[in-house]
C-alpha cells in the first residue's frame, strides 16, 4: 500500500515538475516576444531608440528580429513625412506582413491586415516618374517603397521591402529608403510558406517601428 502511494506521489511530483518547466519555457518565450528592444547592434551598426524624429527607424518583429531602415530619398518628401507620421502615431505597431513573395518583396503596413487598406486613412501623392515626380532610387534588394492601387495617388500606409532587385517597378512606385542592416530578416520573411494568396501561413507580425539614432559599432 505504501509502495503504491509512494509511486502515485512520485508520478504527481514528476508531472508538476514537467508542467513548471514548460510554463517557465513558455514564459521565457513570451518575454522575448513582448520585450521592446531599445538598443542593440545589427550588422555592425549600434542603434538606440529615441523619441526624436529621425531619418532612421528600427523595425522589430514579434520574434525579436530587427531591420534598420534609412529614409534617404530627398526626392520623396511627401512619402517620407507620411511614413514618419505613421511611425509617430504607432500605426504600424502590431501589424503584419500580409503578402510575401520570395524573390520579389514582402508587403505590410495595412491596418486591416488584408491588403485592401483602411479607407479612413488619407492617401498621398505618388512620388514617381509616371506620376510626374522625379525618383531615381531604383528598386534594388532592401529598398522600401509604397504599395498602392491602380490610382497613382492611392498610397497611404502600406509599404513593401524588395527581396530581389526589381527595377521593373522603377518609375511607378515611390521608393523612399532602404534596409541598411538586417537584410537577413528580409530573406527569412520572404522564405516563409504562404497560401495561394501569398499570405504567410505563419503570421509575420511587426512588434513596432521606432525612430532610432545610429552609429558604427
Regions of interest found by a model, annotated:
Residues 1-2:
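N-terminal secretory signal peptides that target proteins for export/translocation
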Amino acid at each position: 500500500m505504501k509502495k503504491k502511494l509512494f509511486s502515485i506521489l512520485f508520478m504527481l511530483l514528476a508531472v508538476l515538475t514537467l508542467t513548471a518547466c514548460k510554463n517557465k519555457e513558455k514564459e521565457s518565450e513570451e518575454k522575448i516576444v513582448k520585450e521592446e528592444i531599445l538598443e542593440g547592434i545589427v550588422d555592425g551598426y549600434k542603434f538606440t531608440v529615441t523619441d526624436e524624429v529621425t531619418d532612421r527607424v528600427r523595425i522589430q518583429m514579434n520574434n525579436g528580429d530587427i531591420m534598420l531602415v534609412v529614409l534617404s530619398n530627398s526626392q520623396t518628401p511627401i512619402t517620407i513625412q507620411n511614413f514618419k507620421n505613421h511611425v509617430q502615431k504607432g500605426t504600424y505597431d502590431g501589424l503584419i506582413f500580409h503578402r510575401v513573395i520570395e524573390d520579389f518583396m514582402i508587403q505590410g503596413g495595412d491596418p486591416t491586415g488584408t491588403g485592401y487598406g483602411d479607407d479612413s486613412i488619407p492617401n498621398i501623392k505618388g512620388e514617381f516618374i509616371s506620376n510626374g515626380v522625379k525618383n531615381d532610387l531604383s528598386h534594388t534588394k532592401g529598398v522600401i517603397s509604397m504599395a498602392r492601387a491602380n490610382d497613382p495617388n492611392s498610397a497611404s500606409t502600406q509599404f513593401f521591402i524588395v527581396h530581389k532587385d526589381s527595377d521593373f517597378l522603377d518609375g511607378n512606385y515611390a521608393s523612399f529608403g532602404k534596409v541598411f542592416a538586417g537584410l537577413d530578416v528580409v530573406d527569412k520573411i520572404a522564405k516563409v510558406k504562404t497560401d495561394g494568396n501569398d499570405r504567410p501561413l505563419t503570421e509575420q507580425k511587426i512588434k513596432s517601428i521606432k525612430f532610432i539614432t545610429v552609429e558604427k559599432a
